[in-house]
Amino acid sequence: MEESVKPVPKHANHRRSSVRSSLYGDVRDLWSTATMSTANVSVSDVCEDFDEEGKSVRNRIRKYSQTISIRDSLNLEPEEIQQQARRELELCHGRSLEHGEDHEESETSLASSTSESLIFSLWKPHRTYWTEQQNRLPLPLMELMETEVLDILKKALITYRSTIGRNHFMTKELQGYIEGIRKRRNKRLYFLDQ
């Protein structure tokens, strides 16, 4: 008696769990299309992984790349993955501007730059990226939700202070959490205004 085994279709239509989808997120959230929307731009001007003919140069040594391997990115939080993608986008975009100038001068200026200025440039968000992200739906929605969360937490803090006291550890912990959200929000708004 022989049993027939049905092959599993490669593209099975099933809903992914919210945990899995939130872990990896949407690719559209990671990359900006601002530089790709320009007509007649060569791939090498946009990304360092390709030469003038559009061939991959992954086998070459990448001096200043900050990419994370897939194995490392599986252990990161979604916010850390997005931050890493933003840094990589800024580095890639910064190199694309240098290709217009003398290539040797850009290499020597990169080599002579201090590590502090390089670290600062990694943390400063790219203006084009943030402008594009601001025009998309998720950023205003995120700000709206963040405002509502802050309002709810402020009311809870007032209740905690009146009920269990100002010096209770839960009151202090909630107050620290609210201050952390405010600092992150102010930092993001500061970079958006520049």
Curated annotation (Swiss-Prot):
It is found in: Cell projection, Cilium, Flagellum membrane. The keyword Cell membrane applies. The keyword Membrane applies. This is Cation channel sperm-associated auxiliary subunit zeta. One of its GO terms (biological process) is sperm capacitation. Component of the CatSper complex or CatSpermasome composed of the core pore-forming members CATSPER1, CATSPER2, CATSPER3 and CATSPER4 as well as auxiliary members CATSPERB, CATSPERG2, CATSPERD, CATSPERE, CATSPERZ, C2CD6/CATSPERT, SLCO6C1, TMEM249, TMEM262 and EFCAB9. HSPA1 may be an additional auxiliary complex member. The core complex members CATSPER1, CATSPER2, CATSPER3 and CATSPER4 form a heterotetrameric channel. Disruption phenotype: Mice are normal but males show severe male subfertility. Mutant males display fragmented patterns of CatSper complex stripes in the tails of their sperm, leading to a reduction of calcium ions that pass through the channels to enter the cell. As consequence, the sperm tail is more rigid, preventing it from moving efficiently within the female. Mutant sperm are less able to penetrate the egg than normal sperm. It is a peripheral membrane protein. Testis-specific. Expressed in adult but not in fetal testis. Not expressed in ovary. Within testis, expression is restricted to spermatids. InterPro entries: CATSPERZ. GO terms for cellular component: CatSper complex; cytoplasm; sperm principal piece. Signal peptide: none annotated. Auxiliary component of the CatSper complex, a complex involved in sperm cell hyperactivation. Sperm cell hyperactivation is needed for sperm motility which is essential late in the preparation of sperm for fertilization. Required for a distribution of the CatSper complex in linear quadrilateral nanodomains along the flagellum, maximizing fertilization inside the mammalian female reproductive tract. Together with EFCAB9, associates with the CatSper channel pore and is required for the two-row structure of each single CatSper channel. It comes from Mus musculus. Keywords: Cell membrane, Cell projection, Cilium, Differentiation, Flagellum, Membrane, Spermatogenesis.
